[in-house]
Regions:
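Donor-sugar nucleotide-binding helix/loop cap in glycosyltransferases
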Residues: 1-356
Length: 357
């Protein structure tokens, strides 16, 4: 049985989260180009020294001194970067190094590091939509089969545009398999029943979930929502509101979908959703060609000029023809799949060989 999709408790300030990555990229990119990786220690020392991370009220070398523990799991600075790194990997901004605790900076990182703010905002929106489990680039605890952000949008759409934090926990983060065609309607019916019954029933559902997955801390489940709630607001897809309309006149805080969010919901509802595991049955070159094609497809939508690849794209489509045929990619108005974020590095490397890069 699937557990709870776990976002690390590191990120509620999306602007800082992005700027921190850009600083990390500029500092460590030359190192990674020599074939070396960087770990949590190198990263947090850089962040603390440059005032981008603090520990126990201090920055710089004093923060590093105060943070050091014999047990790194209790080291505040170590854990700050560890939690950032978990989401950077979900977004495709970090890729695995030689072990779980070190990292490489991918080709895609250059787009995040060097694009203008408006473009970075579009890329971030693209990336959060493509967070997925399972993912060959990172192990996401919980064992869910899930794209969490499209699921958030679909459930909001089914519930009149509103979703509270605890409702997000019991519906989105606890979703075992988003490919169940009945899941959204079933969980929306469940939440409507809970809203009618009152907040006690919502709390009972939370308590039941905690017991099932073995969580004792009262803060753990709410902490998993910090990033998705912040991202929904930062992208402009939702706004935070206080309302008495959901729970019998009781005032609760909730996300409310915006017109921008409605537009995204309509788009993803009409998209073909492909996961890397879907294309594993095809030859390596077909997987690679499709992954590279998806990168160009998504970057063009964001606004990048891909005209230099105009002669290569038909070759990629030919090599990946069985995938295009099975999933009827061109019959849909949109697609959910982004190779930079979802394909293994060896597949992208092979894809670059196919296009002569």
């Amino acid at each position: 049985m699937a557990g709870v999709f776990r976002f690390s408790n590191a990120v509620s300030d999306i602007e800082k989260f992005i700027q921190t990555y850009r600083s990390i990229y500029e500092h460590f990119y030359p190192l990674t180009q020599t074939g070396h990786y960087f770990g949590h220690k190198e990263a947090y020392e850089f962040l603390a020294t440059n005032g981008l991370a603090s520990s126990l009220g201090a920055i710089g070398q004093e923060a590093i001194r105060r943070s050091e523990r014999d047990d790194t799991s209790r080291d505040p600075l170590y854990n700050q970067h560890k939690m950032y790194s978990e989401i950077y990997r979900m977004l495709g901004w970090y890729e695995p190094g030689s072990m779980k605790t070190n990292f490489n900076l991918p080709e895609y990182g250059d787009y995040i590091a060097h694009s203008d703010p408006a473009t970075v905002a579009k890329l971030f929106a693209l990336n959060v939509l493509h967070i997925v489990s399972p993912n060959p680039l990172t192990r996401i605890k919980g064992g869910n089969i899930l794209r969490p952000f499209p699921m958030i949008m679909k459930i909001m759409g089914a519930l009149g545009g509103y979703l509270t934090r605890d409702e997000m926990i019991i519906s989105v983060l606890a979703c075992p398999d988003d490919r169940d065609d009945n899941y959204v309607s079933n969980v929306a019916d469940k939440i409507r029943r809970i809203r009618k019954a009152g907040l006690k029933d919502l709390q009972a559902e939370i308590d039941s979930l905690k017991a099932r997955v073995g969580i004792n801390s009262k803060d753990a489940l709410p902490n998993y929502t910090r990033f998705p709630i912040a991202a929904m607001k930062w992208t402009g897809w939702a706004e935070g509101v206080t309302t008495r309309d959901l729970y019998k006149g009781v005032s609760v805080t909730s996300l409310r979908i915006t017109q921008s969010g409605e537009d995204v919901l309509q788009r993803i509802s009409q998209a073909v959703d492909i996961r890397f595991e879907d294309i594993l049955k095809y030859p390596c070159d077909a997987q690679a060609a499709f992954s590279i094609w998806s990168n160009l497809y998504q970057l063009k939508k964001v606004g990048f000029d891909i005209s230099n690849y105009s002669e290569i794209i038909p070759q990629l489509e030919s090599t990946a023809a069985p995938i295009f045929a099975e999933y009827r990619v061109k019959e849909y108005s949109d697609m959910l799949f982004f190779g930079y974020q979802e394909a293994p590095r060896d597949i992208l490397k092979r894809g670059n060989q196919l296009i002569g890069e």
